[in-house]
């Protein structure tokens, strides 16, 4: 019986959650409540690729100490599950994180994320689209993943395709790319990932430019979902991008 069967949850979710729980239980005086964690996991090799923790901390805290505390917790959790500890460690990659909670982020987001996307047919990372500008990968990378999946089908590389892009705060390139063609693909998964990295600029700036996300009227996406309508640039593969950027729904 593997870890996922024992926990009835995805292993990366278990690792990330238990890391946060451990930090809460240890009650480090340097750390404050706002904390998030993310694990990029290679299911094929059964190993952790990247472990991220971003935690709020006291104004007086030394960031080196914060990183040591979090890295130790990462190693502890990975070892408890018999997993590798030579993964990429990311702790507060954007730097100091003093102001947190609703004082740092506010807005009505997260309302119907499944209805906004694929109705449960595809995996969803949990980040909402609406209420965020396209510099947030919750929005831009979701649209880009959709576009890439459509391109895979359009080029005849597969009959079905799901693209997953995983990002870490403060890192512009995705820390993980996963391609699932449900046994319909013509290319090995590793080759598909290399093709994606070579073909597309997956930084926030690159995706914004490629899809013309500064020119989209997002009011239209507030109803009937964020996909399926051909005038949206991540859906429209027949118009040149210059035209798609300025197309509006009739």
Walk through the language-model features, giving the residues of each.
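Short beta-strand elements
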Residues: 1, 37-58, 101-122, 165, ...
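Short, intrinsically disordered, mixed-charge
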Residues: 21, 25, 75, 120, ...
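Glycine-rich, mobile lid/loop segments that gate access to catalytic sites or pores
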Residues: 1-99, 223, 227-238, 242-245
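Alpha-helical support elements that line or immediately flank enzyme active sites
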Residues: 4-24, 132-156
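Glycine-rich anion/phosphate-binding loop at the beta-strand->alpha-helix junction
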Residues: 62-153
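Internal helix-turn-beta structural module
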Residues: 160, 164-250
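Structural beta-strand/beta-sheet cores of well-ordered domains, especially the beta-sheet scaffolds
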Residues: 35-37, 49-51, 85-89, 93-95, ...
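ATP-dependent carboxylate activation and anion-phosphoryl transfer catalytic cores
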Residues: 54-61, 86, 93, 97-100, ...
